């Protein structure tokens, strides 16, 4: 009997040690070299029918990207003037320096007006706001299409509403639009929440849903009027099933940077984490990882360290000058205005003359630009939930440039390095990136997006055999 008891105790000890060894493994934190480029494809060209009347439906489109597992397809938003949902197939991927050799996706579902033209109905009472609404993100959830919208220039902080639901089969059922709805309550010092939540969305992996308490993350960062949005990546948890049932929809801020808490850098800071030209337009939370990957663009600036400039742009490096230098030149030349590209400057404007080979407009510049990734540890979001840190205390564990083909620093279309959105297929661990204005092979004036695909090259944590165990030998 004693031998049997010793044997049972030994087995229990081994099992406990084995289980402890499993629990000691954390999911991976994804690094740059674990995103393996698999190729790209073109979107359908020309007019795609349905609700679209424009000759090139998807030209200057490609935003709000999301993956639809039911059809193994992608859904995106068409050009800004129409703002229609379009569903396309995922063809065989090709790696080539020649765009014409890429495969072209097929149309799965014709363009549909899923928001019933109400993208700008973002005011607290549901009325339209000035300057229009910009399609933010799309997400397939519980056989519905979840969408969001944000105000392009919301100086008055009027964008309170942001999200809606629509039919996933709009071509047969109609839009079945229901919205717009408010998500979450504003942070302290913020008047309205639309500028923080009205953009990209991402599914939370099952193991993290139980930890964070929400199935979906939504956010937005780096928009005009920076005081009403996040100064960098931003993430709020919410449950889409609450849309239309609870006002506002309960949401928790896990990550955000306000003007009072600019952890990644002030608006005019020299930084590769955040600066005046930063845009954050996509989020992926890969299964089997502890990583949140945010996608967007960054300004590298003349130093390569993220310096920026405000004023008109010039394509001539020799014309770039600070306000003080412009004033000195004007004074030395008898009051003659200084030439900054096509702009004449007196030196009293309070602006610099900014070198930018792809943008001559008056505004913020950070040339050259880069496609960008911010990688965060989900355990930091959990710490926010537990109350041990604030949403603005978190910093990325890594940032890196995302090298996409078919772009050039001097090309007027791809030089700004804009990413329209990101989507994710957990069954294949593939990430889809919509590259803005990259396909101008058929029309130089109406370029199309190109879809690039990365495969996440990591596996779930491997369970190792327990180490340093003492096994008792049972002798009779």
For each feature predicted by the language model, list its residue ranges:
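Enriched but not universal
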Residues: 25, 347-350, 459-476
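Sequence/structural signature of beta-propeller domains
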Residues: 26-459
């Amino acid at each position: 009997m004693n031998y049997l008891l010793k044997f049972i105790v030994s087995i229990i000890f081994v099992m406990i040690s084995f289980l402890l060894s499993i629990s000691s493994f954390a999911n991976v934190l994804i690094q740059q070299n674990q995103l393996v480029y698999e190729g790209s494809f073109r979107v359908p060209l020309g007019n795609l029918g349905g609700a679209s009347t424009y000759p090139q439906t998807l030209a200057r489109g490609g935003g709000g990207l999301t993956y639809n597992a039911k059809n193994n397809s992608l859904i995106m938003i068409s050009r800004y003037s129409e703002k229609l949902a379009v569903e396309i197939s995922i063809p065989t991927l090709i790696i080539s320096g020649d765009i014409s050799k890429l495969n072209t996706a097929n149309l799965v579902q014709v363009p549909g007006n899923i928001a019933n033209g109400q993208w700008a109905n973002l005011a607290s009472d549901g009325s339209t706001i000035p300057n229009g609404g910009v399609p933010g993100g799309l997400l397939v959830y519980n056989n519905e299409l979840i969408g969001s919208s944000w105000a392009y220039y919301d100086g008055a902080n009027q964008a309170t509403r942001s999200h809606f639901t629509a039919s996933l089969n709009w071509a047969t059922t109609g839009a079945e639009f229901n919205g717009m709805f408010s998500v979450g309550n504003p942070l302290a010092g913020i008047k309205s929440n639309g500028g923080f939540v009205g953009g990209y969305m991402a599914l939370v992996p099952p193991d993290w849903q139980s930890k964070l308490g929400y199935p979906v993350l939504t956010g937005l960062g780096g928009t005009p009027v920076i005081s009403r949005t996040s100064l960098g990546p931003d993430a709020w948890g919410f449950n889409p099933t609450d849309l239309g049932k609870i006002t506002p929809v309960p949401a928790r801020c896990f990550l955000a940077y306000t003007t009072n808490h600019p952890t990644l850098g002030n608006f005019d800071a020299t930084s590769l984490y955040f600066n005046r030209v930063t845009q954050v337009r996509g989020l992926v939370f890969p299964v089997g990882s502890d990583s949140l990957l945010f996608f967007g663009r960054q300004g590298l600036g003349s130093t390569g360290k993220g310096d920026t400039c405000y004023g008109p742009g010039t394509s001539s490096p020799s014309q770039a000058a600070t306000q003080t230098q412009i004033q000195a030149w004007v004074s030395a030349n008898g009051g003659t205005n200084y030439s900054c590209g096509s702009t004449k400057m007196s030196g009293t404007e309070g602006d610099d003359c900014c070198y930018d080979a792809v943008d001559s407009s008056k505004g913020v510049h950070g040339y050259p630009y880069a496609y960008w990734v911010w990688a965060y540890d989900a355990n930091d979001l959990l710490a926010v939930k537990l109350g041990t840190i604030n949403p603005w205390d978190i910093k990325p564990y890594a940032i890196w440039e995302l090298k996409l083909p078919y772009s050039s620093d001097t090309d007027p279309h791809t030089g700004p390095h804009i990413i329209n959105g990101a989507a994710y297929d957990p069954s294949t661990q593939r990430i889809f990136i919509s590259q803005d204005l990259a396909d101008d092979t058929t029309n130089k004036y109406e370029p199309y997006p190109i879809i690039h695909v990365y495969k996440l090259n990591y596996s779930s944590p491997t369970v190792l055999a327990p180490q340093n165990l003492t096994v008792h030998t049972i002798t009779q």
